[in-house]
Amino acid sequence: MKVKICGITDVETAKCACEYGADAIGFVFAESKRKITLGLAKEIIGKLPAHVLKIGVFVNESVEVIQKIADECGLTHVQLHGDEENHQIRRLNIPSIKSLGVTSESDMKSAQAYETDYILFDSPKEKFHGGNGKTFSWELLEHMPKELRKKTILAGGLNILNIEEAIRTVRPYMVDVSSGVETEGKKDLKKIKQFIIKSKECSK
């Protein structure tokens, strides 16, 4: 099981997450309490192992701005967390992830229409797109087509207490956590380590 730790804002947390076994680190460039500057993201990315994916999260941003930030920071993927459509996705020259809030089984059909490398299934959006710490009914994704499952990233309220059930139900390619590894709004290294270990153990 691949694991992405999202909403990273400092070098130490990013490096520790990688040492614990994180496969991807997420940087939020959209409005959020975890928003990061281009300069800081570039500094952190420059100190991470080459094999770790560096993913930038954007919400309804222009293709030009996304591409500029991706190029300057050294992102390997961009995550589109707003209302982006295929005509915008096609203009990107970097691998992409499209986020989709899940409210019914029909969202799986909607997901298959996106021309992206991965689909991230999340809880429905609220004030901020993602990072709300709320789960959705994983059973809605239980009967996912095999080809879609191979490119599925599961997010939305995941934590050390529910990750086993989430993985068992959805069987995604990757799991994505942010608020679930925080204490009082800040990333907690102990929780990050526990989450990564549990995710990889329960998917064996």
Swiss-Prot record:
Keyword set includes Ubl conjugation: no
Tree of life domain: Bacteria
GO molecular function: phosphoribosylanthranilate isomerase activity
Cited Pfam families: PRAI
CDD domains: PRAI
Family: Belongs to the TrpF family.
HAMAP family, per the entry: PRAI
UniProt-recorded name of the protein: N-(5'-phosphoribosyl)anthranilate isomerase
UniProt gene name: trpF
